[in-house]
């Protein structure tokens, strides 16, 4: 009898208001602006970009990671940046092309393979990509550009960020996305062999 009384009072008339669940963020932005092509005209024709040449030499490279957010949404960094077409693909990966620049992406994850010499910057990566980057613009998006290395904000021109081994760079326009847990690089891979 006591158990029934407890159950009845537990189901009583008091209703609890629940706040609505927060909206789920959209992972990737909509449309082609959030999925830019892997190369511009210079790379398509294997021409020099900022004195960076497309060559068949395959030096060992180190890895850096670059993420781009616009209004809180991910911009897909394509496979094939810095690899002149015709691309040889294996699924989403670009395995090879006519020649390679000192900066390249083989997978659509933001993982950038960087030749150790000369010292290369985020501006060099965007130049090879054929996409604009400044303190007021990234790709086709305009507005104040925030750049982070790891979790620390970088003041000044984002093009000047020097790419170093295992550096994690985040570039944002619009709604702020707090830098999250650092990118975990594959263990034992300080450099990438050709």
Residue ranges of each PLM-predicted region?
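Sec-dependent bacterial lipoprotein signal peptides
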Residues: 1-9
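Ubiquitin-like/PB1-type beta-grasp interaction modules and other compact soluble beta-rich domains
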Residues: 11-194
């Amino acid at each position: 009898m006591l158990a029934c009384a407890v159950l009845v009072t537990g189901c009583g008339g008091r209703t609890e208001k629940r706040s609505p669940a927060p909206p789920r963020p959209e992972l990737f932005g909509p449309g082609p602006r959030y999925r830019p092509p892997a190369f511009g005209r210079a790379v398509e024709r294997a021409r020099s970009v900022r004195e960076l040449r497309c060559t068949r030499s395959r030096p060992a490279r180190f890895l850096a990671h670059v993420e781009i957010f616009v209004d809180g949404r991910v911009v897909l960094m394509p496979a094939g940046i810095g690899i002149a077409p015709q691309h040889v693909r294996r699924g989403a990966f670009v395995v090879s092309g006519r020649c390679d620049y000192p900066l390249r992406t083989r997978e659509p994850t933001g993982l950038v393979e960087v030749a150790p010499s000369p010292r290369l910057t985020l501006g060099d990566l965007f130049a090879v990509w054929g996409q604009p980057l400044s303190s007021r613009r990234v790709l086709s998006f305009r507005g104040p550009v925030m750049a982070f290395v790891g979790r620390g904000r970088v003041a000044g021109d984002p093009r000047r960020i020097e790419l170093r081994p295992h550096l994690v760079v985040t570039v944002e326009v619009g709604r702020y996305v707090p830098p999250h847990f650092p990118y975990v690089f594959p263990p034992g891979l300080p450099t990438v062999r050709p």
